[in-house]
């Protein structure tokens, strides 16, 4: 979702488009069948696994408007931490999220406290703790204002192991919940949105190859004004 927002912002800011729909989604059964085990097989799930969200989200990026603004972004790089377990995506993606957050804060000279919310997704409970630990090792503490989409998309009573995953996880949480709170003035004015992704295929996961991952960050500010125009 963050990649779509970044591309949409670049295209509208450059004058190549007036309005762009940034959208993505995921489906639980499709992800299980392709990357893990068919549901009909009835396989048990390990405790480190997450449940792919069946959902989709879309945001309109335009040169003008009254919505929160996309003020800056950081394109991530591929990080392979050597994790090969397709049931442990949080651990695989956490290093990429940590690297992008660190690069963003360094490039913008901003402390973590600049943002009311640092929203990652979709690391789940395990990956969320890992990204906080990895950044703490580099002297950056985000624990006070960090929330992961995978942790909050399901209610605790649903017992979805480590939480949600999939492209639809961060898309639904951002568009249906966070942006709505920003528009209503719910105490959230500045958000660093860091969606995470795994660059694996059905073949590589079946062969036991390691899972390279990437994360992109985009700053969304309710009171921000883009330097060259372009509201979200």
Regions found by a protein language model. Name each.
Residues 1-22, 61, 165-186:
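Active-site-proximal alpha-helical scaffold in enzymes
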Residues 1-50:
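A generic, well-ordered mixed alpha/beta core segment in the N-terminal half of proteins
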Residues 24-33, 76, 195-200, 224:
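Acidic, glycine-rich active-site loops and adjacent beta-strand->loop/helix elements
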Residues 41-102, 107-110, 140-152, 157, ...:
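Condensing-enzyme catalytic core mediating Claisen C-C bond formation in acyl metabolism
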Residues 97-131:
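Oxyanion-binding "anion nests"
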Residues 123-138, 203-210:
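Short glycine/threonine-rich loop-to-helix capping motif typified by GTGT followed
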Residues 171, 177-207:
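Internal helix-turn-beta structural module
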